[in-house]
Amino acid sequence: MTDEPTTVYNFQVEDFHTYHVCTLGVLVHNAGKNYASLEPDKYTELTQSEVKDILKERGLDEQAAQNLIDSFDGPIYKREGFKGEAFTITESNAGEASGVFVTRESAGITHTERINNLALPPNNTAMAESTVQLTRSQILLEGKVAAQPDWAVIADDGIPRSGGGWQVVTDGGKYNGAIER
């Protein structure tokens, strides 16, 4: 973590809040003096092979694992998530999304910002945001969202799907009992 001022993009605050940025670029809201527990040593950068091993253990085939890896722009980090830890899920309607992909906070003020920052597929309108909690401790995969220009072409809605948000991959979302609403 750093206590030095850091430039942050795509970020809006309406009131006074305390934020800290770690060397991995993770923005931590209202961490206060306890932010030392969120230091980068809690994150382990993984190789593609290590990510594939984790995803194979979760039941993904080679192509599904590669597609998930390709949804990241840059390094993929592993971190232990704890039961009760809360995340935001972005979906068309409350209850529709799987919860495999979540975020720490909202990925944008408008649905257009959320679609762009998370490079969402054409079937996710991002009109709803809900809070979900982890049902158990689990390994989370985290990193920066990659651009999805092919989805922008398919959607034909003028949203470029540039990515750049921070995504968290749970251990299967609602399909594996990893999250609850």
Task: State the predicted function of each range.
Residues M1-A36, Q133, K144:
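HINT/intein-family self-processing domains that catalyze protein splicing or autoproteolytic maturation
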